[in-house]
């Protein structure tokens, strides 16, 4: 079952979520019919699950469309990336022309700019709602935080990466996040040197971001300590600048 089929699926019982909660194995895509009409209740359910709560105009528009057509629009990430029109997004974060204290004040102001911009992106009505929900999801999965990164430009770059791969290849996203400037700082990649490897990111990548702890059916562990060591060695030398 692919993502598109999943989003088209609808519970088989009239209460909307009952069959899902009861563990029903019926994954047949929802198709409107007389006993299960496409109505305001089902349209609102779809829009809530794929966004942050629909506006009335969105609900009215959805009711005039079909579930399949709405899902096609929601999964279309072919449009241009939204840009944050602030000069600081392309400034050198390590520009020494200003005093460190002044530069830190800039970072604080820029962080507020970034937060407001991102929240506004989530609130924009229309087909980008699901993409923005996925950006939030990936930020919670490949977690980092400004309190350690301290460079607003890098948080902005990471936010754009999650948006680019909102519906893309998980493998490629994992590859990209491994050298993402914010992640390199957050999980100590900048201190990962050939002469003294730092295994923090390698361990997090395998344990939390991808494979997880446990074993396969044949008893083989998902990864070994040696895998962590070798991955850490493979990622030595990366800095926030590349």
Task: Report each predicted region and the residues it spans.
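N-terminal module-boundary/linker segments of secreted carbohydrate-active enzymes
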Residues: 5-113, 122-124, 129, 222, ...
């Amino acid at each position: 079952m692919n993502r598109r089929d999943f989003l088209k699926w609808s519970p088989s019982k009239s209460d909307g979520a009952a069959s899902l909660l009861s563990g029903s194995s019926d994954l047949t895509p929802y198709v409107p019919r007389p006993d299960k009409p496409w109505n305001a209740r089902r349209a609102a359910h779809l829009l809530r699950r794929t966004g942050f709560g629909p506006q009335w105009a969105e609900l009215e528009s959805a009711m005039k469309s079909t579930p399949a057509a709405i899902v096609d629009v929601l999964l279309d990430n072919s449009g241009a990336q939204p840009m944050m029109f602030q000069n600081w997004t392309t400034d050198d974060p390590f520009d020494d022309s200003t005093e460190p204290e002044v530069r830190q004040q800039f970072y604080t102001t820029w962080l507020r700019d970034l937060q407001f911009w991102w929240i506004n992106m989530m609130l924009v009505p229309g087909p980008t709602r699901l993409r923005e929900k996925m950006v939030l999801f990936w930020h919670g999965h490949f977690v980092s935080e400004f309190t350690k990164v301290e460079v607003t430009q890098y948080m902005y770059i990471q936010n754009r990466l999650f948006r680019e791969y909102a519906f893309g290849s998980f493998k490629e996203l994992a590859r990209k996040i491994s050298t993402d400037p914010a992640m390199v700082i957050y999980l100590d990649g900048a201190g990962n040197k050939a002469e003294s490897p730092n295994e923090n990111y390698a361990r997090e990548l395998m344990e939390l971001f991808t494979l997880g702890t446990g074993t396969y059916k044949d008893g083989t562990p998902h990864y070994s300590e040696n895998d962590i060591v070798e991955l850490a060695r493979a990622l030595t030398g990366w800095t926030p600048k590349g």
